[in-house]
Each structure stands twice: as C-alpha cells, then as structure tokens.
Regions:
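Protein kinase-like catalytic core scaffold
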Residues: 191, 274-276, 374-376
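C-terminal active-site "lid" helix and adjoining low-complexity regulatory extension at the edge
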Residues: 5-9, 322-350, 354-359, 368-431
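Glycine-rich phosphate/pyrophosphate-binding beta-alpha loops
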Residues: 201, 260, 281-287, 379-391
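Conserved N-proximal alpha/beta basic substrate-recognition cap immediately N-terminal to
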Residues: 55-186, 199, 349
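Active-site nucleotide/adenylate-binding loops and adjacent lid/helix of ATP-dependent enzymes
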Residues: 138-261, 266-270, 431
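A long amphipathic alpha-helix within ATP-dependent nucleotide-binding catalytic cores
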Residues: 234-255, 265-268, 275-277, 281-369
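Intrinsically disordered, low-structural-confidence terminal and linker regions
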Residues: 1-62, 428-431
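Hydrophobic residues embedded in beta-strands of well-ordered beta-sheets
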Residues: 213-214, 273, 309, 373-374
Length: 431
C-alpha cells in the first residue's frame, strides 16, 4: 500500500474512534429496537477492548482529538453545505451547526453524515435508527467474519467459483502483473480494467475498442503492447474484463459507465440467504468509467417487491445536487421506472450467496444486460452509507438489525439477559 493509502487508512480509523465514542458510552440506551440495543452493547464492549496495540494507540489518539475534530468537522460541513440547505429548507447555519454537535453526543453523527443521512430534517428522531459506519467497519463486521475465508474479495477466484457453479458472472480475461506475467491476449473488444483487489471503483479504467487491437480511454489511443505496459506499470495486479453493456432500457440512466444494482443479502436464522435491501447506481456528468456513489455517482432506492426506482441523489456530503426524479445529465426519468429482469436479479443475488455461505453479509454488484442480470462482484464489508442515504429510517429499525443481532447472539456475544427479548423491526419496503 502507498504512503498516501496508509495515511488515509489511519485517518479513517481515527474518525471511526471519534464517531464511536458516544455510541460506546450510551451502550444502546437510545436504540430504537432491542436488536439495535444488543448490537450497540456488543459494539461498546469491543470499542473499549482493542485487539492489538495499534488499535489501542488509535483509540487514545481518537479520544484526544474529539474536542477538536467534532466542532471543526461540523464547522467545515456547515460552511460547505449549510447555505444550500438554508436556501432549500429554511434552516439557518447556526441551527445546522448546533444540531450537528447535539447529534454527535446523542448518536455519534460526525460532519458529513449529518448531510449524507439528511439529518437536517427530523435529525433527533431519526439519527439513532442509523447503523453507523464506525459500528460496522470497526466492530460488527469483524465479529461476523467466517473462518474459512471464501474468495469473495479475490476477483479472479470469485469469477472462477461462480463460473464453475453456473452462476452468471463477468469473466476474468487476464490478470496483468509485472511480477507474474499473464500470457493471455487482451480480448479485442471494449475493456474494463480494475485492481485485482480493491473497492469503491478506485483505480478502474475503461478502454473502448477503436480499431483492430487498439483501444482508447477518451484521451489516449494505444495498441496492445503499449496498453499492457501501461497496466504493468500500475505497480499492482490488474484484472481485465470485457466491458458489460447495460440493457437498452437503462442506457438513458447513465453518462457512460455501466449502471449496477447493489443488492444486500444476509444469512437468515435458518442458514438461508435473504435479500435485505437494494439500490440502483448510475454515473452522471463527465464520469464514464464507474457508477460508484463514493466516486461521484448517483443512486436511488429499489423496491424489493417490484424493482421500481425512487428519487435519486449523490452521496450527499456535497449538497449541491440534492434530490432529483430525473437523471441530471440525460434528463431521463428515474423515479417510478421499473428495472428489467427484477425477479431474476433477486434470484441471482440469493443464489450467488449460497456459493459463499461462510460470509454472513454480502453486497452484490449486479449489472442488467439485454440477456438478463450478471454478477460484477461481491463485497464482504458492504457500505451502509450507500443504502441508508436513501432510507428515512435506518438499519437499526430494520430486518438487517434483527439478523445481525441474531448472529451475534448465536456466537455468544450478546449478554444472556437479552436472549429472550423479542425484536420489533420495520421492513425495508415499508419506508
């Protein structure tokens, strides 16, 4: 990993410590459901018991920075987004700033998440219902991790396992690495190239075929040898795939990148995968490579019942776009549109999870083509911001919390006094 990557990782973990402090102190006292209370009690126990010396150092550093980082983050994002929210909703800058501070102490809401989760609207009532990134990335995910480690994050092995089981998945055409030469030729078609391991669309490139064994990324046109050399010079293994073209009905919903469904599945109480939630991701503006919302893309809610789309937005940490019923680049209608092959998309997500049954929670990226849905990849630590951005009530008051609490209980992490409690949750499509 590069020095910049290490610094970013350390900063991210420090933010998790800062955001997690109020949650750990409250130990679920303001949780909206018994399931959420159990999750937060488990998280609190883990928060104060670092696994490694490095984790202990990060805990101390994060606690020291709380009095500085929290007001500075609130100030920065108020300056960035506050005038826009004031114009749209009439809430003043001081009111937004003060509410961010109050919601930090009440629910661990730091800077950008106040705007990501639209907590400038009914924040005090809604904030405790959201499952925070710090709770999953620095807590619960580690406790839910399986021991066998199926190759979900290894893109080539992932594709091979899916192909062997007859699950439709984008194939790996070649892996390019200067340490281990792949003798396969590049397929003479449009290409999508990304790091062998990685997430968030970082490092991905799109190369369109412009002639026999020549490709262009919109700025450069290269032949096969030059293109292979470019990939080898990346300093890390790169996977080459044929670029997937979207279903014709979905082409108006993208500025060029292939749009995908992010489908969240989790193993239920009987050991069967269950579809929990889904969003649809789209590119807009100058982005023609990836649809990831963290890379500046759009997303919208998908009704599990019939595959209809809700209103769209970006991640929300930048409030300029806001919410829209139409695609901001193409003008095509988003809200109310029904995804093609929706029953098949749901079936594919469930079936794929059976191939990686040691993973309790998986986020699937699924493209919908003219021939039906096809898996792009699976994510072992799925991002909750992407899903909860489009929810009025968060995952703590949802089926997902019930399943997480059940698995924590089954693994012995939940205190005995909570084991007989019944949990009341809201189904996703009730939102």
């Amino acid at each position: 990993m590069s020095i910049g990557g290490r610094i970013a990782g350390e900063l991210e973990r420090t933010i998790y410590v800062i955001a997690g402090l109020p949650i750990a102190l409250r130990r679920g006292s303001n949780a909206p459901t018994v399931a959420a209370r159990d999750i937060r009690r488990v998280y609190a126990s883990r928060y104060w018991r670092p696994d490694r010396p490095r984790d202990g150092i990060e805990l101390v550093v994060g606690l020291i920075l709380v009095p500085i980082a929290v007001p500075l983050a609130a100030l920065w994002f108020t300056i960035k987004n506050g005038p826009i929210i004031r114009q749209r909703e009439g809430k003043g800058l001081l009111a937004q700033f003060g509410e961010q501070l109050r919601l930090y102490f009440a629910a661990g809401i730091v800077g950008p998440w106040y705007y990501i989760l639209s907590l400038h609207r009914d924040g005090p009532q809604r904030a405790p219902t959201f499952l925070q990134r710090c709770e999953t990335k620095r807590g619960i995910y580690a406790l839910l991790r399986g021991k066998t480690g199926s190759p979900l994050g290894e893109k080539r092995k992932f594709a091979e396992r899916c192909a062997a089981a007859g699950v439709r998945c984008v194939a790996c055409e070649a892996v390019i690495d200067r340490k281990a030469m792949d003798t396969a030729e590049l397929p003479d078609c449009d290409l999508f190239v990304k790091p062998l391991t990685g997430s968030g669309g970082r490092g991905a490139e799109r190369w369109d075929r412009v002639g026999r064994r020549h490709w262009s990324n919109g700025k450069l046109t290269l032949g096969e040898t030059a293109l292979m050399d470019r990939f080898r010079d990346k300093g890390r293994p790169m996977i080459v795939q044929k670029r997937v073209r979207p279903h014709p009905a979905l082409e108006p919903l993208t500025s060029g990148a292939t749009p995908t469904v992010r489908a969240l599945t989790m193993v239920d109480e009987q050991g069967r995968p269950e579809l929990i939630a889904a969003v649809f991701r789209m590119s807009f503006g100058a982005n023609r490579t990836v649809d990831n919302i963290h890379a500046g893309g759009l997303a919208c809610w998908v009704s599990l019942a019939d595959g209809r789309l809700g209103r769209a937005s970006n991640l929300g940490s930048d409030a300029r776009l806001g919410w829209t019923s139409d695609h901001p680049s193409t003008g095509a209608r988003i809200e109310g549109r029904q995804l093609p092959f929706w029953p098949e998309v749901k079936e594919l997500a469930i079936r794929a999870h059976t191939l990686f049954a040691d993973r309790l929670l998986i986020g699937w990226d699924i493209a919908i083509t003219e021939d039906g849905p096809i898996l792009i990849e699976g994510n072992r630590g799925p991002d909750m911001d992407l899903m909860q951005r489009f929810m009025d009530i968060g995952f703590c008051d949802h089926r997902l919390a019930e399943l997480i609490a059940w698995h924590l209980r089954a693994r012995g992490y939940v205190p005995n006094d909570a084991q007989a409690s019944k949990m009341s949750v809201v189904r996703v499509d009730a939102q």
